[in-house]
């Protein structure tokens, strides 16, 4: 009987150890989608720019003025673009769905120009930049709600293939 108890205790211990080891082996350092992308982004690549710097800034309704958050992102963009001068890029201006097509095209153009002016003031050669406005024609979120509208009021810096 004692022998069977020892065997049973040994089996329990072995089972606990097996579970613990298997859990430890499966415990990868889950970085999440962004962390995994950031660690996989090659420095100086388009993915590096998007993931580690940020390719877009957002605006308040009917505004072209850069917010403190937008300025922080654009400061990082300027540093990155100084380091990787082989890229030319396009600044896309966007607006939410409210307002006329004409109004939103003009607003998107002013937003793109605000970003271009900021980057120029930080030493980025204006010859590397192009601006375009899509107005409300290319929303990233579609719904009749402020949560969607705020995502669509943006300027996106799109890198062109390096030469």
Over which residues does each language-model region extend?
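A generic structural micro-feature
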Residues: 147-151
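A non-catalytic structural micro-motif
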Residues: 85-94, 109-140, 153-163
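Extracytoplasmic/secreted proteins, especially bacterial periplasmic and envelope-associated proteins
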Residues: 69, 73-76, 102, 110, ...
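Short, solvent-exposed beta-strand edge segments and adjacent coil->beta transition regions
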Residues: 54-56, 102, 154
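Short beta-alpha junctions and helix-cap segments that line functional grooves
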Residues: 142-145
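Bacterial N-terminal signal peptides that target proteins for export
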Residues: 2-15
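C-terminal motif of bacterial Sec signal peptides marking the signal peptidase cleavage site
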Residues: 21-25
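Periplasmic peptidoglycan-binding/tethering modules of Gram-negative envelope proteins
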Residues: 27-88, 161-163
